[in-house]
């Protein structure tokens, strides 16, 4: 039985000015009704070139995919704030813009079906934003806006563009994301002043050879389409800095990609790539390369020439080895993700290959050993993820990993943690769940910066008293072990907010648990020998979630136990010696 404690239900206030059904119907007819809110946030209404936002899903967190155009999004409005517009209101906005000689017009989120032809009069405009409307086409008159530099049409239902747009000789940014284009409109290839082109999330299947005409492009995003190949002419985009072709159906890249030597960000994740051309080594400016979720079985040696590379993500391919000395050649590499591949050993190349690495993710491979000394030069290595491998032990120099901040060793076959874990003095997160640990080293108490310790699903029978020294600990997970008691020193963990003790053999909780003044979540479920709870538990004033399923608690009145956690806490408050304090 799990419960949220002390939560009050939000009262629902009625809108005193709610429109009648007839009024709503009349308004709906005038505005054309509302469309569903798009799940993608709106881009900012600025015509600046977009840069990759760090730390997507996908990214630039190490081991996480990155999206090169996600920094131009702006938050969705609060519910109920979407604007309704009749055609008359839109015309009114156009007139106001003309009278004030405004250079910027934002008609986003107006449920516009058809843009009035009078738009042609606003020849002074340099920026026009039409995000999140219901446009299926644009009037030819938009071609009269000869000073336009930014045209934002994201989140509409466009299937084509008028040929008159080729009059927009000054257009630099064109945003066509989230429309219904089945091809790149031919007029787009004639907009040779474009520097930024967003075509994400359409239904495009091909990129024509005419892409070569857009020689000024620095940003091209065509992710989330159905593109099966890129033309050789892509290599003529010599000013390209960011190329995002993620989430398509590419099996190969043209060798001409090597001519795009200015590229810094290349996102190819979630395709069907079987190989990479050797010419990729010509991308001397490349700093971020995303190749996760493809079908690669090898990486070309030429990649070693990409000496500016800082982030390399190869997650979920079929790679079992890397070219020797590849990593040592990438002297600026700080984030390396090799998760979900076929590695049985660490890459060949010795300690020097990790000298600049900050984050290393090798989760879900078949590695059974971390070589001794492999991190002896890894002075900045802060995050290591070895989850879901076949480790049975840790190297003898384990205690020298003094820069480590986050260490994930979950889902291996470790039977013990070396005593010299005490040397990992920078450690803040330690994940050891799903191993074969029967006890913990006393040196664990030296990890004074530890905020999270996860020991779920091991074979622990007790905890060392030194755990009391982990005073910064906020999350302690001990679920599914064989604990019968807790050390009294657990009461010193006053910063603890989450304590997982479910699926153990606990017979009681120490009264010191009452000193956990910041405890918010307590999981006691499935402890078949837990018959009572200490009155001191009532002193945990911030406790909001407590789980007691499948605990007998026979020393408490049955009707109290049946009432659930909130009843139990109330009982402990009122019946215990601390009722005057709570």
UniProtKB/Swiss-Prot annotation:
Residue windows of the LRR repeats: 101-122, 124-145, 147-169, 170-191, 193-214, 216-237, 239-260, 262-283, 285-307, 308-329, 332-353, 356-377, 380-400, 403-424, 426-448, 449-470, 472-494, 495-516, 518-540, 542-563
Gene3D superfamilies: Ribonuclease Inhibitor
Keyword set, alphabetical order: Cytoplasm, Leucine-rich repeat, Nucleus, Repeat
Main subcellular location of this protein, as a coarse class: cytoplasm
Keyword Cytoplasm: yes
Signal peptide as annotated in the record: none
Biased composition (Basic and acidic residues): 1-29, 36-57
Location of the motif RVxF motif: 63-66
Domain of life of the organism encoding this protein: Eukaryota
GO MF annotations, alphabetized: protein phosphatase 1 binding; protein phosphatase binding; volume-sensitive anion channel activity
UniProt-annotated stretches for the region Disordered: 1-88
Record localization: Cytoplasm; Nucleus
Example of a GO cellular component annotation carried by this entry: nucleoplasm
Single GO BP term: regulation of MAPK cascade
Comment, domains: Contains a N-terminal RVxF motif that is important for interaction with PP1c. PP1c (all isoforms) binds to the concave side of SHOC2, via LRR 2-5, 8-11, and 13-18. M-Ras/MRAS binds to the concave side of SHOC2, via LRR 1-10, 12 and 14-16.
Family membership: Belongs to the SHOC2 family.
Function: Core component of the SHOC2-MRAS-PP1c (SMP) holophosphatase complex that regulates activation of the MAPK pathway. Acts as a scaffolding protein in the SMP complex. The SMP complex specifically dephosphorylates the inhibitory phosphorylation at 'Ser-259' of RAF1 kinase, 'Ser-365' of BRAF kinase and 'Ser-214' of ARAF kinase, stimulating their kinase activities. The SMP complex enhances the dephosphorylation activity and substrate specificity of PP1c.
PANTHER family registered for this protein in UniProt: LEUCINE-RICH REPEAT-CONTAINING PROTEIN, PTHR48051
Subunit structure: Component of the SHOC2-MRAS-PP1c (SMP) complex consisting of SHOC2, GTP-bound M-Ras/MRAS and the catalytic subunit of protein phosphatase 1 (either PPP1CA, PPP1CB or PPP1CC). SHOC2 and PP1c preferably bind M-Ras/MRAS, but they also bind K-Ras/KRAS, N-Ras/NRAS and H-Ras/HRAS; these interactions are GTP-dependent and both SHOC2 and PP1c are required to form a stable complex. Interacts with PP1c in the absence of Ras GTPases. Interacts with M-Ras/MRAS and RAF1. Interacts with ERBIN; disrupts the interaction with RAF1 and Ras, preventing the activation of the Ras signaling pathway.
Protein name: Leucine-rich repeat protein SHOC-2
